[in-house]
């Protein structure tokens, strides 16, 4: 053990500890700006400086090793003045337009200026402005960069992408896209982890609120919104709502208060993804297709493969993500059921919806996947009535609320735009949702809870856990077991794929056939897994990868909390919701069975492939 004293308080810590650990362990405090626990301790900002008796210069607490007998002072006049000077210098190079910054009120630099009582900056203002393509889903404002290098560290150590790099040195130190490339050329996966770890507004997601507001105000548009599983765990954080108020029902009511005509649950899309992806897995296990099969619902992961390992794209499931499956079904199936005609040629022929069909309530008498409703029988079910009730002829504007930045890219991929109309028109992150609620002055706490709209309102528990790492794998195995055996497994039979470990592996028996699975979150972990597969060190049948550590619960579009990682807590909320669901299997969802009965026939049918599958090799970056 190493013994030291911090502001008069003795402390003993293991060898190898840093001064900052001693400070916090002793109940004292030092501010930080560039530091990220376990990721970055480069001491670039010099905000965490402390005074050590016998040492002439001040030292950064974050990366100075703790030595036996150290006497540390965190708040001497010299220390405080040095911090004030260092933060003032940062402010002199910062475009201090706080009122119009997305991080206003949630900015480390802003907090430091207030904490240190900096009322004026006595240095010449020298913010730097670098041009940026603001149509790209990720925006960098160089005038707000404080050169903390967090983005460089996270992109390298956590994601292994190395998009950001140091430019110049010493007093001319700057950060930018590596090798002088544009962001489009540098291989950015749009995971957004640099955004959630940036201490200021230098990095943000493209804001699409104005496009949504324009649609909401258009009388010729029907606005529908779909809500991803992980959003329900975090949306209240943007408004400082306690979890008991930030319920699913109040979330649905909030979207209605914002003016949306329909509020749907992306859990329906997740259940459909499981049916298609699980069926595809069984096909591949039977020798049809490249093995192992990789999940395909994370666009950050798809971008990573396209950029780093284009030779591995055949391993991806062809199933679209829940967002995109939902979008396709909304505009081609549900839109017709509700009396809206999508502006696409052949839409009536594409969706064989029965005339006078209900809104998907009730369970089909034919089990999904039995072949009882093949393409021919569905086509014979009758064409949609042109006189169906509803806002006939109005255009559907489909908004998705996601915990993800890469979803903005995915929605705009040419493969997801049929005719001239995208399946998903706009994507809002959870942070944008919070800003939209404030903009529209919605008093969320005063709203009564309401359900999501039919026919996409009742997702299974399997769909809910999509938002946690391992959730897609667990949900797929639940239904794959049923498709093989005709009976349900214990819904908790596959919980061993849960957890925040970066790379997990397990084998399960699916009716006499052993299935070897792996789960990875964080792209640096995914790279290690790919290398092991390539080297023949491991063999798997099914691999789930989520670009963000912890999965969508830790997504790049989630609320930002300085020095706190909440993916684990949010994941636990999703597991609790799963346990409370009346239906915990995707194949038992009433809306899923009705959709196959009325529209698709069975998983992997021709119609299902046309609507719910894609070829990622054709995606443009």
Task: Name each model feature, range by range.
Residues 15-69, 75, 79, 206-621:
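Iron-sulfur-associated redox domains of electron-transfer enzymes in respiratory
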């Amino acid at each position: 053990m190493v013994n030291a004293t911090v502001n008069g308080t003795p402390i003993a810590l293991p060898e190898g500890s840093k001064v900052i650990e001693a400070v916090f362990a002793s109940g004292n405090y030092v501010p930080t700006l560039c530091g990220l626990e376990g990721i970055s301790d480069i001491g670039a900002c010099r905000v965490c400086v402390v005074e050590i008796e016998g040492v002439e210069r001040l030292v950064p607490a974050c990366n100075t090793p703790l030595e036996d007998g150290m006497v540390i002072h965190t708040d001497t006049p010299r220390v405080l003045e040095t911090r004030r000077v260092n933060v003032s210098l940062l402010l002199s190079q910062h475009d201090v337009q706080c009122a119009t910054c997305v991080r206003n009120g949630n900015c480390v630099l802003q907090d430091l200026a207030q904490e240190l009582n900096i009322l004026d900056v006595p240095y010449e203002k020298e913010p730097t402005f670098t041009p940026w393509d603001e149509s790209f889903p990720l925006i960098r404002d160089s005038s707000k960069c404080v050169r903390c290098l967090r983005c460089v560290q996270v992109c390298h150590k956590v994601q292994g992408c190395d998009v950001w790099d140091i430019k110049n040195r010493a007093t001319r130190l700057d950060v930018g896209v590596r090798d002088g490339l544009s962001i489009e050329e540098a291989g950015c996966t749009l995971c957004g982890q640099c955004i959630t770890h940036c201490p200021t507004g230098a990095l943000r997601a493209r804001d699409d609120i104005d496009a949504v507001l324009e649609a909401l105000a258009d009388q010729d548009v029907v606005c529908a919104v779909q809500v991803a599983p992980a959003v329900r765990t975090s949306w209240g954080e943007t408004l400082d709502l306690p979890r008991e108020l930030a319920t699913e029902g109040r979330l649905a009511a909030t979207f209605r208060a914002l003016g949306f005509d329909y509020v749907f649950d992306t859990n329906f899309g997740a259940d459909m993804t499981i049916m298609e992806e699980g069926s595809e897995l069984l096909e591949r296990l039977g020798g049809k297709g490249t093995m192992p099969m990789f999940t395909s619902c994370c666009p950050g992961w798809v971008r990573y493969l396209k950029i780093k390992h284009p030779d591995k794209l055949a391993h991806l499931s062809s199933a679209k993500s829940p967002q995109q499956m939902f979008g396709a079904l909304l505009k081609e199936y549900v839109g017709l059921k509700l009396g809206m005609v999508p502006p696409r040629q052949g839409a009536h022929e594409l969706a064989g919806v029965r005339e006078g069909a209900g809104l998907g309530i009730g369970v089909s008498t034919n089990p999904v996947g039995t072949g009882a409703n093949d393409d021919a029988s569905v086509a014979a079910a009758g064409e949609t009535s042109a006189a169906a009730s509803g806002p006939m002829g109005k255009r559907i504007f489909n908004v998705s609320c996601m915990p993800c930045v890469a979803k903005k890219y995915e929605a705009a991929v040419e493969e997801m735009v049929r005719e001239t109309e995208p399946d998903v028109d706009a994507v809002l992150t959870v942070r944008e949702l919070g800003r939209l609620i404030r903009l529209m002055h919605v008093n969320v706490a005063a709203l009564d809870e309401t359900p999501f709209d039919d026919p996409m309102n009742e997702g299974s528990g399997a769909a809910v856990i999509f938002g946690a790492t391992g959730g897609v794998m667990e949900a797929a195995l639940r239904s794959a077991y049923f498709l093989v055996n005709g009976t349900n497994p214990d819904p908790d039979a596959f919980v061993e794929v849960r957890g925040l470990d970066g790379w997990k592996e397990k084998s399960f028996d699916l009716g006499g056939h052993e299935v070897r699975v792996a789960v990875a979150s964080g792209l640096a972990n995914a790279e290690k897994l790919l290398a092991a597969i390539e080297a023949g060190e491991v063999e798997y049948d099914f691999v789930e990868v989520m670009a963000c550590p912890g999965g969508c619960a830790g997504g790049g579009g989630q609320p930002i909390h300085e020095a706190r990682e909440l993916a684990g807590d949010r994941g636990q909320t999703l597991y609790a919701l799963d346990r409370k669901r009346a239906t915990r299997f995707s194949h038992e969802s009433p809306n899923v069975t009705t959709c196959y009965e009325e529209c698709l026939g069975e998983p992997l049918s021709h119609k299902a492939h046309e609507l719910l599958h894609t070829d990622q090799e054709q995606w443009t970056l």
